[in-house]
From Swiss-Prot:
Name of the molecule in the record: Coproheme decarboxylase
Keyword Heme listed: yes
NCBIfam families recorded: PRK12276.1 (NF008913)
Pathway membership: Porphyrin-containing compound metabolism; protoheme biosynthesis
Keyword Iron among UniProt keywords: yes
GO function term, MF aspect, one: metal ion binding
Length: 251
């Protein structure tokens, strides 16, 4: 049997995409709308406390197009904690007007294609660089891009039949492209084999949305992607600070 990749795993991730039911929201009187927005604000304040004590992260982006209106991206140290956030959110009154359109579950990961190199032989979980990747601080960048992807298992283009050494080389070459965008694009890779319909969820952050187009285009021509990658839907959005939520919902 081919050697399986080993991973270092960090925070669990939920990308929760919602569409606003504007027709139903318009039927509410302003007083009820205000009560719901205040309840949402208290919920987000509690999320901020969790973030400040280093036990998780979260952010909200406004999504363009008809796939969704919002994405709530939450990271926690266990599936139980992530599920608790999800359930509490769904119990908010405003959740009745935020219709689920898509979700993705993953765990931030580093594979042994890269992790041993980064750790330099020490316990990787004690390495500051590795920990920063596994338990990332989400940057307040203007734009987000999320997409799921998998590796092919088609005939000669079967990623899982390649020897470990060849996979390592392809991933390192692929990673060189990503590193060339340092300072322009921040990337979080969530492993989702056994968790969701694809094998990874990729989240990109940037202050220039065109950098998403540039990095994805360049990577498409790299062999690891050109021969072996399959992609799901792409979601693009703009940062939505919590203090701007009331403005969004004002009609």
């Amino acid at each position: 049997m081919n050697e399986a990749v080993k991973t270092l795993d960090g925070w669990f991730c939920l990308h929760d995409f919602r569409s606003i039911d504007w027709a139903a929201w318009r039927e509410l009187n302003p007083g009820n709308q205000e009560l719901m927005l205040n309840e949402l604000s208290h919920f987000l304040s509690d999320m901020e406390i969790t973030k400040n004590i280093g036990e998780g992260e979260h952010t909200i982006y406004s999504i363009l197009g008809q796939k969704a209106d919002l994405v709530f991206f939450t990271l926690r140290d266990s599936l139980e904690a992530l599920n608790e956030v999800e359930n509490r959110f769904n119990k908010l009154a405003i959740a009745d007007y935020l219709l689920p359109t898509y979700s993705y579950i993953s765990v931030v990961e580093l594979s042994n294609y890269l992790a041993s190199h980064m750790a330099g032989g020490e316990d990787p979980y004690q390495n500051k660089g590795v920990r920063a990747r596994l338990y990332p601080a989400l940057p307040p960048k203007k734009h987000i891009c999320f997409y799921p992807m998998s590796k092919k298992r088609d005939g000669a283009d079967n990623w899982y039949m390649l020897p470990m050494e060849e996979r390592q080389k392809l991933i390192r070459d692929h990673g060189l492209i990503g590193r060339s965008y340092a300072g322009k694009v921040q990337q979080i890779i969530g492993g989702s084999i056994g968790f969701d319909d694809y094998e990874w969820g990729v989240t990109l952050f940037s202050d220039d949305a065109l950098e998403f187009k540039r990095i994805v285009t360049e990577m498409r021509f790299d062999e690891a992607s050109a021969r072996y990658a399959e992609f799901g839907s792409f979601f693009i959005g703009n940062l939505l600070p919590s203090e701007n939520l009331s403005k969004l919902f004002t009609i």
